[in-house]
Amino acid sequence: MIPTLDEGHRIGALLAALAGAPALVARIVVSDGGSADDTLSIARRHGADVVTGPPGRGGQLRRGAERIADGWIWLLHADSELPPGWAGALRDTLARADPGRAYYGRLRFASGDVRARIVERLAGWRCRVLRLPYGDQSLLIHARLLAALDGVPDLKLMEDVALARRLGRRRLAPMDLVIGTSARAYQRDGWFRRAARNLIRLLLFLAGRDPARLAKAYRR
């Protein structure tokens, strides 16, 4: 399942990869927040079921998940990049997966910059020590477990962290699958400046700051 908002310039590759593994991916759900570009036509062209509603990643993921009553749900971002062999790695994870747990991937930026590797290591530390994977690492979760947790939190920002906290440390585990993601924001803002801003937002959220206020700051 993929939340989208004007992602026509990059979502095609991800949809093509998923649609190319029909024995593994039974259904693709795109939950759109009001795209004005060709996102929806691209999604439908790849056979995706489209859900529409107000923008906001938490709400979009929540609406999309409500369309899936059973089975495993793989939450992805529109800029996620699946590496060669991803289908086999996902199949191996599913073969031994516990429906009472959720699984996250290993972050990899689409950049050869050495600073990208440092930020990736910091993300790995966050997952190992805090068990707080971000949405750009993807999350594989069973529909029944997600429903038992009252679905994806309807937040403008930090819905991934809020869901991870609902799951708790014991119900989160890594999977042996690299998830590529765009480095555009880090290249624009500066690798360490962006990483520091993300850390500050995380700490503010954990301290109880309103996610809507954090989302406004995030867009600046």
Predicted region positions:
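A conserved acidic beta->alpha catalytic loop
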Residues: 32-40, 80
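Hydrophobic helical membrane-anchoring modules
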Residues: 165-220
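Acidic helix N-cap motif at the loop->helix transition within catalytic regions
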Residues: 9-13, 37-46
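Conserved donor NDP-sugar-binding/catalytic core segment of glycosyltransferases
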Residues: 84-115
